[in-house]
């Protein structure tokens, strides 16, 4: 069960990178990049931080560099920082999309955007609370923090759209939550 839980992180993390190259590279390149990235970037960093490696609380850095410790409860470093760095590098290498920013393409189906955002919101409960590895108070606090964070982001995005455009949008609310 723990292995499958960890594999969901490994499978979902490349999805965060997709926005940097969507519609600009071929599907075979996506599969090739994803496989290489998981093996050579994600897996080593997950081990270094979560698996007792040199950046973990039990590793070399903690024992050698007094006061140095790494705490990554649910993937801030392993998932988000790694994906962000990869996305920035890919975006820089590929350059801007054709027609951007003069041609902005709105989403084709706002209903599906909202369903996807809702699925992500619920999925975060599993990732964040599941990282406690127990159904206890820490997991409950993780779920509460997850919900409050996403809800606050929605409200802030609504306010920003209202100030900027005079009315909020469904896609904007979903974007804020994500």
Predicted regions and their residues:
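Hydrophobic alpha-helical transmembrane bundles of multi-pass membrane proteins
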Residues: 1-178
């Amino acid at each position: 069960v723990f292995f499958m839980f960890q594999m969901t992180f490994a499978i979902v993390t490349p999805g965060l990178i997709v926005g940097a190259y969507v519609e600009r590279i071929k599907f075979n390149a996506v599969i090739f990049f994803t496989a290489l990235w998981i093996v050579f970037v994600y897996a080593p960093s997950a081990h270094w931080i979560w698996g007792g490696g040199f950046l973990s609380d039990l590793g070399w850095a903690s024992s050698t560099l007094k006061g140095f410790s790494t705490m990554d409860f649910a993937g801030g470093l392993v998932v988000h920082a790694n994906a962000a760095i990869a996305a920035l590098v890919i975006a820089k290498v590929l350059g801007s999309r054709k027609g951007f920013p003069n041609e902005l393409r709105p989403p084709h189906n706002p209903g599906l955007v909202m369903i996807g955002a809702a699925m992500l919101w619920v999925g975060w409960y599993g990732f964040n609370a599941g990282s406690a590895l127990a159904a206890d108070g820490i997991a409950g606090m993780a779920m509460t923090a997850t919900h409050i964070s996403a809800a606050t982001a929605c409200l802030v995005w609504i306010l920003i759209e209202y100030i900027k455009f005079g009315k909020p949008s469904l896609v904007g609310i979903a974007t804020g939550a994500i």
